Amino acid sequence: MEAEKTLTNEEIIRELLDLLKKNTMKEQANDVFEICTYVDGLEKKIVSMTEELTSMQDQIKKMQEDTLINNAKKALTEAQERLNARCEQIKSQVFEIKVQVKSTAKNIVDETKAKGGATLCRVTEFVGIKKRLLNVRTEVFRLYENYCKKMMQHDIIGLTKAA
């Protein structure tokens, strides 16, 4: 997945934003920038959650071997695996949206160069992308809440073990 370059720094996005601003479509430029910022933020959040899930997995492996801990360890491992799978699923959705945003921007820019500024009205295609993105964003927040609950359980087990 192409996580090294943020969508807001993509050349084609910058070009589309410039075209929109030059054609007095500042509101549409702001909408496109907002969508790109959402995608960038979601990518960062998913990377952070993936790192934390990996850390959680490492901590689970280090837990002592006794029955109570083993039961908790098994439950936490299963929860961590479910969260990790869901995180990967959402990461894939965000990547698809990112590709769609770049493709739509490229099509609009290319068409504008070929046919003129009137084709910038196609920027309304980003509205559909925004709706999809907001749905993914909601999923990320649900996943993060679930992750936080599991981490609290993990911390409680750690305190019990220490006592």
Residue positions per predicted region:
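Generic detector of well-ordered alpha-helical segments enriched in charged/polar residues
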Residues: R14-L17, N84, K91, C121, ...
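Extended, low-complexity amphipathic alpha-helical repeat segments
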Residues: I97-A163
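Leu/Val/Ala/Ile-rich N-terminal alpha-helices, chiefly Sec-type signal peptides and the beginnings
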Residues: M1-E88
